[in-house]
């Protein structure tokens, strides 16, 4: 059993002071809590003999905690006529559920006689003790939080008024003078009368110490019940005390008061708590109450600190007047930090570019190379460490270690190149610095001047010069001697040796210059060096920016990559001129096989395999960066003030890609040369087409047809190559969805040209359907009229399935994955369905109708032209089905398509206007042909020469479509070939005068003549299908007087049948055969 002495040894003055401060703070939060009770207590002491019945409301008890209890008051109801008595406030009780009804309160006066010990001063504690009855025989002592302490020089007995419940047992707490507590046995109190009596309790004063006062309440069995005392000067300890049963003599006074004298029995272990010096701190585990109290204080301070910092963030970011919740403040702060990081990154990149430019300027001024290398190395290392410090995030809490990885990137996954263990802390070699383009051009100019004037000639032939001077000075006689001397010195051997030596020296000089320019002058980045780490960091960030579509940030990161590699974009016109001139010279030299062989077998190239591998790797990385910058420049994502910037980027990419050798894939090499061909076509649209053809052929030779990627396979076709070289296409800087193709990669010019090629194929296919070939060679061919259109559609279907990914591709090259163009596929199905209807093939119409109904999400389905196409296809499908209500449904969809077509003509089209007009012409022709077919089906096979008047709705719709065709013919010349035929048809449907109808049909029967040489005249002439349809209409609906003899009509029908069979119109061919059968039967009957 732990004694009080041991407990006293464990306590320190610091612990006691901390607890006292905490208790005083708790009490200070309720300053006026006990003012009323103290006033009532004072009045109760003055009138002790007055009795007052009180009603006591019992409150719900709360769970007991070891922390400082909060005072709780129970309301006391007093009648107005009674004198107010003092009521003691109840503190936090034990969690014992009371089930008994409210007991009556009885006040008794108990006289306690404690033991005294001599002390200079006496402290008197006035404490009301409240005894509460529970369901069990145990009791709880509730002690108020405020005690009034009085000190007197003389020991005087005082009375303490207490409210005592009528219970089965009572516990009385006494304080010993030496700091210990004696617990008495339960005393039985008998209630004589049912009313409440006032019993004063007389307690003798006792001498205690404030530092060692301990109060402990125990049960009858000796276990402690309550160990917390709300007193700033009292330390509460729990311990098992020895209890001794005492007989309490009870005396009854004359006035009904009960006087009880209770002797106090002291415990066996009665030692005061030792005072520990304040400077001594015992390392011990804090008790439960202290731990929770300290934890609460820490939590409160932590929350206060967090709130203060959040308020400080709000003041910094949004100002002091802004109002926003904590999460909003943190979000704004995060956005502002990201913005500052981007600004710092841009400033660091500009700083790096300026430092590199400063280094190159110093190099040109003739500064010692070794000192420049050392300075640049130290500067780069310091800047790299500073950048790492700025890029690394701060520690999340104060307990986190203050170390960081200088190569960690938050936005990228872990990479072996970014590990600190694998990064070599080695400086760049002197050859890795490279030469500037101005230095290269200066060296080339000096070499050319040296070879032009050739000062070595005078050094190798000094005698010939001296002899010529002597011959001139000594006249004719010396001239003969001179001739003899010249024959002696002018032998072929004397001439050959100096010449060979001269050319050898010149060759060595030229080869040395080439080695300096092409090998040693190239900047080389060492593998796993700090420059390499920084390069890959920015290149990965550029890939992420391209994937997100942030082309400005991607271009900035790519330019930073060039600066890290020792290369930078030209900043002035002089730099651009020098760079472009050097790249043209280098491209010309690399195409010469002898120069490539000499450079490949030179000592500087073969001196070290590791250096060669690093040089080719650096060339490959630089070529990829130049290639991506060139793509951004061509697509308008990298604006430039100079026209030759794109040409310079293209030549840089080509030269470095050829220097990379096997380090670069054939697919990427072909893509680089193809992009250069696009640049040549853009820079020289009408001249120097051989340059475009040269780079295009090199791209095709660099990669075979098997390894050629799908997005570039269309260039292997003759139509694709012809379109690339001779067509007037233009790159679109803004890649948006159109009515005919879906969006390609906005940063890849090859995909943009592929998109233009697909639209060109679709335009040719639809134009061939709407206006077939009218030339004499085409008319003599036995092939189908729509065969050329079917070839175009077949090519379109194949190339639309190999578009390539729409998202931005990484710098490593094109992605092998390919995707189809859903919009191109949809228009392919529409065109195939139209060809099936014109050929009379119902199976083709039914097979493609399901694909037409699946409208792509990327297609603008709200466009009137698209809606007209959809309703036109539905009308054809309803006419083909042949159901009882098929004609009615077909007529309904024809009306819908006609209305949308008229709206599309009123709207100014944006995009490919020629293709829009071709589609509108095709829709007009199909709608008019479909209405003519429906009218002929309703005519119920009339005899030759008879005509049936069409219904008014059908005639109105036909006239509206004919008006659309007339309006389209004003701006589109090929619409004239359809106009005469459909005007004759509407006159037949209206049963108009046959004279004008015959003239219109006669115009449709015209053939191509030798006078129609212009393209406009050819476009206005009708095709073979229109001539055959005009013959059928004339033979079926015109009167017999407008035609020749029956034999001539049979000849015309036979010619129309051959034409329809050649063009592949099965439906019209079947109708023509039926007319020929009827005509032959009628002729036979007339002849008989």
From Swiss-Prot:
The region called Leucine-zipper is annotated at: 340-361
Q: Give the Polar residues compositional bias ranges.
A: 59-70
The GO cellular component terms are:
endoplasmic reticulum membrane; ER to Golgi transport vesicle membrane; Golgi membrane; nucleus
Chain positions covered by the region annotation Disordered: 59-87, 392-431
State the superkingdom: Eukaryota
Q: Which residues form the bHLH domain?
A: 290-340
GO BP? cholesterol metabolic process; positive regulation of cholesterol storage; positive regulation of transcription by RNA polymerase II; regulation of Notch signaling pathway
Listed SUPFAM superfamilies: HLH, helix-loop-helix DNA-binding domain
Membrane-spanning ranges: 441-461, 495-515
Q: Where is this site: Cleavage?
A: 443-444, 481-482
Cytoplasmic compartment segments: 1-440, 516-1088
Q: Which SMART domains match?
A: HLH
Family statement drawn from the similarity comment of this UniProt entry: Belongs to the SREBP family.
- Write down what this protein is called: Sterol regulatory element-binding protein 2
């Amino acid at each position: 059993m732990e004694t009080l002495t041991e407990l006293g040894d464990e306590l320190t003055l610091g612990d006691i002071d901390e607890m006292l401060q905490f208790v005083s703070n708790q009490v200070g939060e309720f300053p006026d809590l006990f003012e009323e009770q103290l006033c009532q207590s004072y009045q109760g002491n003055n009138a002790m003999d007055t009795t007052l019945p009180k009603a006591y409301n019992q409150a719900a008890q709360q769970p007991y905690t070891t922390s400082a209890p909060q005072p709780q008051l129970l309301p006391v109801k007093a009648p107005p006529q009674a004198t107010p008595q003092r009521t003691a406030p109840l503190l936090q009780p034990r969690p014992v559920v009371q089930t008994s009804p409210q007991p009556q309160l009885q006040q008794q006066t108990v006289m306690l006689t404690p033991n005294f010990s001599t002390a200079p001063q006496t402290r008197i504690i006035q404490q009301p003790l409240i005894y509460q009855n529970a369901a069990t025989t145990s009791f709880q002592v509730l002690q108020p939080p405020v005690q009034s302490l009085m000190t007197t020089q003389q020991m005087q007995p005082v009375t303490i008024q207490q409210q005592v419940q009528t219970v089965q047992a009572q516990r009385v707490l006494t304080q010993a003078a030496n700091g210990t507590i004696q617990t008495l046995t339960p005393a039985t109190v008998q209630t004589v009368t049912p009313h409440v009596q006032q019993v004063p309790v007389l307690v003798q004063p006792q001498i205690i110490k404030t530092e060692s006062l301990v109060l402990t309440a125990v049960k009858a069995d000796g276990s402690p019940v309550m160990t917390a005392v709300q007193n700033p000067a009292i330390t509460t300890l729990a311990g098992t005390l020895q209890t001794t049963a005492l007989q309490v003599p009870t005396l009854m006074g004359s006035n009904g008061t009960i006087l009880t004298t209770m002797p106090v029995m002291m415990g066996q272990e009665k030692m005061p708590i030792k005072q520990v010096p304040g400077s001594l701190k015992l390392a011990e585990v804090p008790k439960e109450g202290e731990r929770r109290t300290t934890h609460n204080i820490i939590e409160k301070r932590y929350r206060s600190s967090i709130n203060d910092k959040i308020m400080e963030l709000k003041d910094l970011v949004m100002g002091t007047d802004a109002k926003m919740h904590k999460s909003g403040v943190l979000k704004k702060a995060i956005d502002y930090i990201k913005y500052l990081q981007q600004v710092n990154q841009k400033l660091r990149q500009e700083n790096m570019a300026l430092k590199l430019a400063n280094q190159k300027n110093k190099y040109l001024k003739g500064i010692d190379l070794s000192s420049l290398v050392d300075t640049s190395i130290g500067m780069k290392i310091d800047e790299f460490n500073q950048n790492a410090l700025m890029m690394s995030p701060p520690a999340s809490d104060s307990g986190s270690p203050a170390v960081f990885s200088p190569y960690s990137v938050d936005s990228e996954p872990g990479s072996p190149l970014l590990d600190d263990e694998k990064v070599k802390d080695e400086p760049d070699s002197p050859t890795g610095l490279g030469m500037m383009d101005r230095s290269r051009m200066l060296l080339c100019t000096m070499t050319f001047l040296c070879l032009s004037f050739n000062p070595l000639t005078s050094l190798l032939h000094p005698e010939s010069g001296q002899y010529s001077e002597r011959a001139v000075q000594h006249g004719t006689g010396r001239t003969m001697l001179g001739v003899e001397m010249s024959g002696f010195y002018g032998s072929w051997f004397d001439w050959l040796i100096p010449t060979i030596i001269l050319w050898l020296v010149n060759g060595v000089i030229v080869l040395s210059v080439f080695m300096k320019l092409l090998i040693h002058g190239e900047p080389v980045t060492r593998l796993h060096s700090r420059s390499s780490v920084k390069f890959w960091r920015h290149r990965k960030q550029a890939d992420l920016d391209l994937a997100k579509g942030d082309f400005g940030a991607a271009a900035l990161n790519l330019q930073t990559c060039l600066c890290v590699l020792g290369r930078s974009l030209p900043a002035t016109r002089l730099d651009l001129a020098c760079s472009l001139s050097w790249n043209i010279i280098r491209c010309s030299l690399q195409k010469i096989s002898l120069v490539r062989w000499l450079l490949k077998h030179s000592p500087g190239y073969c001196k070290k395999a590791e250096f060669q591998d690093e040089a080719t790797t650096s060339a490959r990385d630089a070529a990829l960066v130049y290639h991506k910058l060139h793509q951004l420049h061509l697509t308008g994502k990298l604006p430039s003030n100079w026209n030759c910037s794109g040409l310079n980027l293209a030549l840089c990419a080509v030269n470095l890609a050829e220097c990379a050798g096997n380090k670069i894939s054939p697919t990427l090499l072909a893509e680089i040369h193809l992009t250069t061909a696009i640049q040549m076509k853009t820079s020289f649209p009408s001249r120097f087409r051989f340059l475009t053809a040269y780079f295009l052929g090199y791209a095709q030779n660099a990669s075979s047809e098997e390894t050629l990627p799908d997005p570039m396979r269309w260039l292997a076709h003759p139509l694709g190559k012809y379109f690339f070289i001779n067509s007037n296409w233009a790159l679109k800087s803004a890649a948006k969805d159109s009515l005919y193709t879906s969006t390609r990669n906005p940063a890849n010019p090859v995909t943009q040209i592929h998109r233009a090629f697909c639209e060109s194929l679709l335009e040719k296919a639809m134009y061939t359907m709407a206006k077939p070939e009218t030339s004499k060679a085409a008319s003599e061919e036995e092939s189908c009229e729509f065969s050329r259109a079917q070839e175009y559609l077949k090519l379109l279907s194949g190339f639309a399935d190999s578009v390539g990914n729409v998202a931005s591709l990484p710098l490593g090259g094109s992605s092998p994955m390919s995707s189809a163009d859903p919009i191109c596929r949809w228009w392919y199905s529409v065109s195939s369905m139209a060809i099936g209807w014109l050929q009379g093939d119902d199976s083709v119409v039914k097979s493609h109708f399901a694909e037409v109904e699946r409208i792509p999400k990327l297609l603008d389905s709200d466009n009137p032209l698209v809606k007209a196409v959809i309703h036109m296809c539905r009308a054809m499908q309803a006419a083909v089905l042949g159901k009882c209500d098929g004609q009615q449904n077909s007529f309904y969809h024809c009306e819908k398509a006609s209305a949308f077509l008229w709206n599309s003509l009123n709207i100014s089209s944006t995009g490919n206007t020629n293709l829009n007009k071709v589609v509108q012409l095709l829709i007009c022709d199909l709608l008019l042909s479909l209405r003519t077919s429906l009218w002929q089906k309703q005519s119920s096979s009339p005899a030759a020469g008879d005509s049936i008047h069409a219904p008014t709705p059908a005639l109105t719709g036909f006239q509206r479509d004919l008006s659309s065709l007339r309006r389209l013919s004003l701006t589109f010349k090929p619409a004239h070939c359809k106009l005469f035929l459909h005007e004759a048809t509407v006159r037949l449907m209206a049963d108009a005068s046959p004279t004008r109808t015959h003239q219109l049909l006669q115009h449709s029967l015209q053939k191509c003549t030798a006078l129609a040489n212009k393209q406009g005249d050819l476009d206005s002439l009708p095709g073979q299908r229109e001539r055959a349809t005009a013959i059928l209409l004339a033979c079926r609906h015109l009167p017999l007087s407008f035609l020749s003899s029956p034999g001539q009509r049979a000849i015309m029908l036979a010619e129309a049948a051959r034409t329809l069979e050649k063009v592949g119109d099965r439906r019209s061919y079947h109708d023509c055969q039926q007319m020929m059968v009827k005509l032959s039967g009628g002729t036979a009957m007339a002849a008989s």
